[in-house]
């Protein structure tokens, strides 16, 4: 009986982990971006509710923004999230998704991706594939709060 409970708990923990290594239609491009929240966007805190930042061009030489740019947001789950701006259905690099409230909307196919809890899943349209998600790492020192986005 005890072995059965250990198996069930391990299975639940394994299923609860977020898998960022899924296969996406959006081409796998390098992502390495650092956002200094303290200096550049002091309002961009998870305590302030849902907010978004769209990054379409890099400032520094060694910043990589994926396929069509980055969408970084604070979701209602109290976490920072990041995804590629490329719609997995259209794959138009020059026509990235646009933020409209709690949704990212493709201007070509009108696909709506729900950003509210960080999953970027489609809710209206033709595809069943979410936006390509990237890993976010929050780093806090005594004076600065930075968010790294990587793949």
Regions found by a protein language model. Name each.
Residues 102:
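Winged helix-turn-helix DNA-binding recognition segment
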Residues 19-99, 117, 132-151:
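N-terminal pre-ligand scaffold of iron-sulfur
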Residues 89-90, 108-111:
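Short Cys/His-rich metal-coordination motifs, predominantly Zn2+-binding knuckles/fingers
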Residues 113-125, 136:
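Short metal-binding segments enriched for Cys and/or His
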Residues 13-16:
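C-terminal motif of bacterial Sec signal peptides marking the signal peptidase cleavage site
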Residues 2-8:
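Sec-dependent signal peptide recognition
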